[in-house]
From Swiss-Prot:
The modification Phosphoserine is found at S168. Inhibited by divalent copper and zinc ions, but not by nickel or cobalt. Inhibited by its prosegment, but not smaller fragments. Inhibited by 4-(2-aminoethyl)benzenesulfonyl fluoride (AEBSF), a serine protease inhibitor. It catalyses: Processes precursors containing basic and hydrophobic/aliphatic residues at P4 and P2, respectively, with a relatively relaxed acceptance of amino acids at P1 and P3. Glycans are attached at N148, N236, N305, N515, N728, N939. Residues 1026-1037 have a biased composition (Basic residues). The gene is Mbtps1. GO terms for cellular component: endoplasmic reticulum membrane; Golgi membrane; Golgi stack. Residues 877-900, 1026-1052 are annotated as: Disordered. This is Membrane-bound transcription factor site-1 protease. Residues 1023-1052 are cytoplasmic. GO terms for biological process: cholesterol metabolic process; lipid metabolic process; lysosome organization; membrane protein intracellular domain proteolysis; mitotic G2 DNA damage checkpoint signaling; protein import into nucleus; protein processing; proteolysis.
Length: 1052
């Protein structure tokens, strides 16, 4: 029995040890237990870049040796009499190969030297050298993860040196994941992202990323890191003599892609090529990236992960090199940015058509608050942005490799990017015909297989959540073809098709523009054969709409655009209903093989269209938003509208009703107004169709013809509402910044708004703004308001209504750090044109209350009241009888604000052009003219449901069956039309959680069962050994003897 007790004790110890071991296996990255009293550290990453003084990147129109490049530059500069120049040496692995650029330093006569260089026939472009900074900052956060674990979070930076404030990704994660605080502990546990996305299914099929070359552009990697077994090459592109990662970010990214143990990556057998492009001080240069990109092309990389970016999509050397990379069959994956939830905050290069742009979600499939939103802003003001991100995946609380081993958790889209890069690497290794793999085909597979998230629009989720197994199914039977993104246009489908679905179309309205991306998996170059064809469905009233096309003449690299303008025909001016049709386009690409020299591959794609038409609304309900006169960064330095926001120096979100004025647009739609966007001069719209023209935060100048036309329009009934912003040349000089590293000044090209231009526009009505700069809280009509860096009204007609307030003089505070209070500052003016049938004019000195960027208190109620006044002539009693109403200022004795001497606005203006002396207006451009496509009517019924997963040709997901390695693994099944995209799993368990949590319990139960069986056999053996042997019977002892030795009773 003692032996039995001993074995039972051993069993108990083993079971307890197994339970403890299971806990350790479930939380291998947690080196210590959570301690509520400890603070959790969040690592914030910020990016910025500056122009390096005297240094320029000379881009050639081909690849040349160092001797030839030197010869070209020398011969070009001889004629310019520039003597003090030199070529900056670049000692890196690509210096032994021909290059397409050189970095030079010119310290005298820069302008003459640059012009002479650009005139050389072998030189394509000369641009300034840029210095990139990345800073890492630790901040305390909620103590939800263990004390010793550091969660990283990244904040991207604009391409100017004043740093943007980092969003707190920890708090943003909680805002995004739901409302049930009792579930936070579950969400706080970092997940094994590879298993969550079911990469282990492909591993068990024998696919582990072997023979796929992956480039990781980051902070390097230690040589003997225990998580990696196939680091093929490490290269250093910095000025530091080390290849190791001294910060950990590059190690984490590489681990998500290819770690082989602990926090396992997607492709452990992939060939890792580590490009160290950041120093330990987090400094990099554009030239370092260009050299590294050239080397990646030379080494024939298959996949490249780039977890950095910024808003400067006009950084030509960088953008051009990204195009060249993808043209050389490098699949680039890049993070979309961490500037959410604001719209219009996409980062480059992820916003390029040929790059896979990745957004972030949490492990409950909610869009991460920090993830940047679309649309792209390249196309403004004349066009409309594209759908981005392309896909979303896990980017909050993801586990990856620590710098010295172990695991750590990070958050940010720079985390989501390597998740997709690792998935792509694994997918590429599954393709037998590797020649079918290219940036377009992989992107086609990812977006066609993505799972749509319910209740989220396309500018937040792109095509949906990454689905690794469905992407594998598609690539397994892929045939080269063209496809479209988005694959259909349904202006009635909300919320996915927001903002298109938020407003029906009608006759006389501005054409609705949909920007579709063409992906060409047949070749790096292609073209659209003939013209796109418009085929309306007659039974579905397709003849009530007309369409026009604008498209890429050449599809390169791997992609192009198809802009579709949709309008309503005159016969449907009073009609209401749904109209449908489809567009057919044929894409052709040259055959790549020598056997088919001169031949072409073709692919025909159908684009369904569905729109809702209503009768033309009354003029009073139609508001026209002026987009043409809004300027942004890039390319110019247009400063922020709220000077308090020192951490966000640039006005870079597009100032569009679907980007940083989204909430205002939503509010106007909820109030019954129809908002249209003008992307052309004032001479290009019919003012009789609109009740109010809305000018908000305008930075552009005005053509003289525009000023004259607007005066006529207002006299004939058009109303004008202007929300201005600050403008003060002294303050502009003050908010210029001096970069200590480059010793260069950056000067704003205008103020928050262009007050001199607005005053010229308003001068015919004796109105104008001042260059005063004011700030403060106040109450107007029982509403709390905040005036953020606004200007005042300098003059206004005597018979107008003017509202004043008491504010702080922010201009004095900025210039002299002194505080002063100014009473009776005119901020709001209302005026009725006296002529019969005349319109009304409203001026307000601050637009921040409408702008989503840094709004503290909205003034949507005020906009409602002003539109009631401009549309119906009803002056709000709360304003006309306000105690703050004062006599309108006459402007006497006040000098009007002047344009700042030496400004460079003409470089970025659509109105001004450079001229000797002051810039002069350009000739007025012609108004856009649309050529409507000739319809080819179809007498057939349109499909009832346009939303299907983008079926690529010759691919049937039902026929591609995945092996069932585990009997309890949920199987992937194709979506039927109209489904929400959820997995079909009994009990509603998400597949990632099922595999990770339930799957990990199987070995525990197996171990317990083995221990129970072992204990059973041990007990049986012990019983057998302790059983007494049979003995021969003996004669009984005398009774006396028995009484002398009484039996012992067992003690309990």
């Amino acid at each position: 029995m003692k032996l039995v007790s001993t074995w039972l004790l051993v069993l108990v110890v083993l079971l307890c040890g197994k339970r403890h071991l299971g806990d350790r296996l479930g939380t291998r990255a947690l080196e210590k237990a959570p301690c509520p009293s400890c603070s959790h550290l969040t690592l914030k990453v910020e990016f910025s870049s500056t122009v390096v003084e005297y240094e320029y990147i000379v881009a050639f129109n081909g690849y040349f040796t160092a001797k030839a490049r030197n010869s070209f530059i020398s011969s070009a500069l001889k004629s310019s009499e520039v003597e003090n120049w030199r070529i900056i040496p670049r000692n890196n692995p690509s210096s032994d190969y021909p290059s397409d650029f050189e970095v030079i330093q010119i310290k005298e006569k820069q302008k003459a030297g640059l012009l002479t260089l650009e005139d050389h026939p072998n030189i394509k472009r000369v641009t300034p050298q840029r210095k990139v900074f990345r800073s890492l900052k630790f901040a305390e956060s909620n103590p939800i993860v263990p004390c010793n674990e550091t969660r990283w979070s990244q904040k991207w930076q604009s391409s100017r040196p004043l740093k943007r404030a980092s969003l707190s990704l920890g708090s943003g994660f909680w805002h995004a994941t739901g409302r049930h605080s009792s579930r936070r502990l579950l969400r706080a546990i970092p997940r094994q992202v590879a298993q969550t996305l079911q990469a282990d299914v492909l591993w068990q099929m024998g696919y582990t990323g072997a023979n796929v070359r992956v480039a990781v552009f980051d902070t390097g990697l230690s040589e003997k890191h225990p998580h990696f077994k196939n680091v093929k090459e490490r290269t250093n592109w910095t000025n530091e003599r080390t290849l190791d990662d001294g910060l950990g970010h590059g190690t984490f990214v590489a681990g998500v892609i290819a770690s082989m143990r602990e926090c396992q990556g997607f492709a452990p057998d992939a060939e890792l090529h580590i490009f160290r492009v950041f120093t330990n001080n987090q400094v990099s240069y554009t030239s370092w990236f260009l050299d590294a990109f050239n080397y990646a092309i030379l080494k024939k990389m298959d996949v490249l992960n780039l977890s950095i970016g910024g808003p400067d999509f006009m950084d030509h050397p960088f953008v051009d090199k990204v195009w060249e990379l993808t043209a050389n069959n490098v699949i680039m994956v890049s993070a979309i940015g961490n500037d959410g939830p604001l719209y219009g905050t996409l980062n480059n290069p992820a916003d390029q058509m040929d790059v896979i742009g990745v957004g972030g979600i949490d492990f409950e499939d909610n869009i991460a608050r920090f993830s940047s939103r679309g649309m792209t802003t390249w196309e403004l003001p004349g066009g409309y942005g594209r759908v981005k991100p392309d896909i979303v995946t896990y980017g909050a609380g993801v586990r990856g490799s620590g710098v010295k081993g172990g695991c750590r958790a990070l958050s940010g889209t720079s985390v989501a990017s390597p998740v997709v890069a690792g998935a792509v690497t694994l997918l590429v290794s599954t393709v037998q015909k590797r020649e079918l793999v290219n940036p377009a085909s992989v992107k086609q597979a990812l977006i066609a297989s993505a799972r749509r998230l319910p209740g989220v629009n396309m500018f937040e989720q792109g095509h949906g959540k990454l689905d690794l197994l469905r992407a594998y199914q598609i690539l397994s039977s892929y045939k080269p073809q063209a496809s479209l993104s988005p694959s259909y246009i349904d202006l009635t489908e909300c919320p996915y098709m927001w903002p298109y679905c938020s407003q029906p179309i009608y006759y006389g309205g501005m054409p609705t523009i949909v920007n579709v991306t063409i992906l060409n998996g047949m070749g790096v170059t292609g073209r659209i054969v003939d013209k796109p064809e418009w085929r309306p469905y007659l039974p579905q009233n397709g003849d009530n709409i007309e369409v026009a096309f604008s498209y890429s003449s050449v599809l390169w690299p791997w992609s192009g655009y198809l802009a579709i303008s949709i309008s309503v025909t005159k016969k449907a001016a009073s009609w209401e209903g749904i109209a449908q049709g489809h567009i057919m386009i044929t894409v052709a690409s040259p055959a790549e093989t020598e056997l088919h020299s001169g031949a072409e591959h073709t692919s025909t794609v159908k684009l369904p269209i569905k729109v809702k038409i209503i009768p033309t609304p009354p003029r009073s309900k139609r508001v026209l938003w002026d987009q043409y006169h809004n300027l942004r960064y890039p390319p110019g330095y247009f400063p922020r509208d709220n000077l308090r926001m020192k951490n966000d120096p640039l006005d870079w979100n597009g100032d569009h009703v679907h980007t940083n004025f989204r909430d205002m647009y939503q509010h106007l739609r909820s109030m019954g107004y129809f908002v249209e966007v003008l992307g052309a001069p004032f001479t290009c719209f019919d003012a009789t169709q609109y009740g109010t023209l809305l000018l908000v935060d305008s930075e552009e100048e005005y053509f003289p013809e525009e000023i004259a036309k607007l005066r006529r329009d207002v006299d004939n009934g058009l109303s004008l509402v202007i929300f201005s912003d600050w403008y003060n040349t002294s303050v502009m000089r003050k908010v210029k910044f001096y970069d200590e590293n480059t010793r260069q000044w950056w000067m704003p090209d205008t103020g928050g708004a262009n007050i001199p231009a607005l005053n010229e526009l308003l001068s015919v009505w004796n109105m104008g703004f001042s260059d005063g700069l004011y700030e403060g809280e106040f109450v107007l009509a029982n509403h709390d308001m905040y005036y953020a860096s606004g200007c005042s009204i300098a003059k206004f007609p005597e018979d107008g209504v003017v509202i004043t307030q008491t504010f702080k003089d922010q201009g004095l505070e900025v210039l002299k750090q002194e505080t002063a209070v100014v009473e009776n500052v005119p901020i709001l003016g209302l005026y009725q044109i006296p002529s019969e049938g005349g319109g009304r004019i409203v001026l307000y000195g601050d637009s921040n209350c409408l702008d989503d960027s840094h709004r503290q208190k909205d003034c949507f109620w005020l906009l409602d009241a002003l539109l009631q006044y401009t549309s119906y002539g009803v002056t709000p009693p709360s304003l006309s009888h306000s105690g703050n109403r004062q006599r309108p200022p006459s402007g006497a004795g006040l000098a009007p604000p002047e344009r700042m001497e030496g400004n460079h606005l003409h470089r970025y203006s659509k109105v001004l052009e450079a001229h000797l002396g002051d810039p002069k207006p350009r000739p007025l451009p012609a108004c856009p003219h649309l050529s409507w496509a000739k319809p080819q009517p179809l007498n057939e019924t349109a499909p009832s449901n346009l939303w299907k997963h983008q079926k690529l040709l010759s691919i049937d997901l039902d026929k591609v069956v995945l092996p069932n390695f585990r009997s309890n693994r949920p199987q992937v099944r194709p979506l039927s039309p109209g489904e929400s995209g959820a997995w079909d799993i009994p009990g509603g368990i998400m597949p990632g959680r099922y595999n990770q949590e339930v799957g990990q319990t199987i070995p525990v139960f197996a171990f317990l069962g083995a221990m129970v069986a072992l204990a059973f056999f041990v007990v049986q053996i012990s019983k057998a050994k302790s059983r007494p042997k049979r003995r021969r019977p003996r004669a009984k002892r005398p009774q006396l003897a028995q009484q002398a030795h009484p039996a012992r009773t067992p003690s309990v």
